[in-house]
């Protein structure tokens, strides 16, 4: 059975991990989902690495919602760097799914964005694991997660 890791934070203002799990359950069968929740985004890299090394996850989603302040953007960058290092150390994909609080002014629009981005990245995970040729066909299509696609040039 394929194991997939979901790692999210208590700092986030929306349950992106729950949305990703819901999407995975709707569109896959025979996978085991292991969820871990950490306080903030800087905790994601080690938690994701542990899901891979200790739980045997074949792919992991790291979901977080950095705040709007400059220090939050710095923390998001550091977390992103840590996630890249964890991927290289484990030779395993970790899909970074961040929604910055200042991407939308309206809380309802932020909620929709967070839900859509989590679900669309869950679809990416499914394609990477089970339908990699589909991603190849979509190369250069300007696809976006959470917002409208930009389209090809």
Curated annotation (Swiss-Prot):
Gene Ontology biological-process entries: riboflavin biosynthetic process
Protein's name according to its UniProt entry: Riboflavin synthase
Pfam families attached to this UniProt entry: DMRL_synthase
Family indicated by similarity: Belongs to the DMRL synthase family.
Enzyme Commission identifier(s): 2.5.1.9
Cellular component terms per the entry's GO annotation: riboflavin synthase complex
Keywords (A to Z) from UniProt: Magnesium, Riboflavin biosynthesis, Transferase
Regulation of catalytic or functional activity: Inhibited by EDTA.
Signal peptide segment: none
Catalysed conversion reaction: 2 6,7-dimethyl-8-(1-D-ribityl)lumazine + H(+) = 5-amino-6-(D-ribitylamino)uracil + riboflavin
Organism: Methanothermobacter thermautotrophicus (strain ATCC 29096 / DSM 1053 / JCM 10044 / NBRC 100330 / Delta H)
SUPFAM superfamilies: Lumazine synthase
Cofactor or coenzyme needed: Mg(2+)
Gene Ontology molecular function, alphabetical: riboflavin synthase activity
Keyword presence, Cytoplasm: no
Listed pathway(s): Cofactor biosynthesis; riboflavin biosynthesis; riboflavin from 2-hydroxy-3-oxobutyl phosphate and 5-amino-6-(D-ribitylamino)uracil: step 2/2
Keyword Manganese attached: no
Protein origin, superkingdom: Archaea
Subunit structure of this chain's protein: Homooligomer.
NCBIfam families (alphabetical): ribC_arch
């Amino acid at each position: 059975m394929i194991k997939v890791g979901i790692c999210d934070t208590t700092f986030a203002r929306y349950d992106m991990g729950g949305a990703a799990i819901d999407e995975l359950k709707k569109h896959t069968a025979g996978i085991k989902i292991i969820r871990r929740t950490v306080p903030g985004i800087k905790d994601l890299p080690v938690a994701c690495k542990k899901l891979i090394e200790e739980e045997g996850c074949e792919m992991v989603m790291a979901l977080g919602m950095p705040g709007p302040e400059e220090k939050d953007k710095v923390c998001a960058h550091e977390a992103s760097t840590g996630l890249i290092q964890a991927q290289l150390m484990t030779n395993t994909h970790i899909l970074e799914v961040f929604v910055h609080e200042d991407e939308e002014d309206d809380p309802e629009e932020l909620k929709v964005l967070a839900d859509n981005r989590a679900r669309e990245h869950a679809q990416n995970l499914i394609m990477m694991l089970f339908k990699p040729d589909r991603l190849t066909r979509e190369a250069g299509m300007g696809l976006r997660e959470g917002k409208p696609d930009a389209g090809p040039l």
